Design a protein with these regions (language model features):
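NTP-dependent small-molecule kinase module
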Residues: 84-87, 100-140
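Walker A/P-loop
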Residues: 16
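ATP-binding Walker
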Residues: 13
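A glycine- and Lys/Arg-enriched "phosphate-lid" helix/loop adjacent to the NTP-binding pocket
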Residues: 58-105
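Hydrophobic anchor at the beta1->P-loop junction of P-loop NTPases
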Residues: 7
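Glycine-rich phosphate-binding loop used to anchor ATP phosphates in small-molecule kinases
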Residues: 24-63, 70
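P-loop (Walker A) phosphate-binding loop of NTP-binding proteins
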Residues: 10
Length: 140
């Protein structure tokens, strides 16, 4: 059962855009937001904030009915998105490693996780797939 959807990823991967698409295309039947479980774990790594195993496990348990949608983008595309939007510079390597760390933790749990590359797929295509995942999972 999926009770909510969290859209995750580095800055400028298209999280907020996808939130709107999934919210609308799912008929607003399920809460959709950005920056949740995965960002909590990843940014604890980026900013050297200690997260105990106990806290991590409690977060994973609390998110058992969450669909985590992790958005990535090709590096050159991501760099261009940052540049043309005048976004503050980030250490791409550090942030990508932190999100990959969070991904490994989530994949080792019961939390449903899917990854999409926004350099390769449009928001509409991704939202269609996410809505299909929600429908299929909630039929079980």
């Amino acid at each position: 059962m999926i009770a909510r959807v969290e859209i995750e990823g580095l800055d400028r991967t298209g999280k907020d855009t996808l939130v709107g698409y999934v919210d609308y295309m799912s008929g607003r039947m399920i809460p959709v937001g950005s920056r949740g479980l995965m960002s909590t774990i990843a940014y604890a790594e980026v900013f050297n904030r200690f997260m105990s195993t106990e806290l991590t496990n409690k977060l994973l348990e609390a998110n058992k009915e969450t669909l985590v949608v992790y958005l990535t983008a090709d590096r050159k595309d991501l760099e261009l998105r940052h540049k043309i939007s005048h976004h503050e510079p980030i250490d791409f390597d550090k942030h990508e490693k932190a999100f990959e760390y969070a991904k490994r933790i989530i994949l080792g749990s019961d939390v449903l996780f899917f990854e999409f590359n926004t350099s390769k797929q449009t928001p509409y295509q991704i939202a269609e797939m996410v809505c299909t995942i929600i429908e299929e999972e909630n039929k079980k």
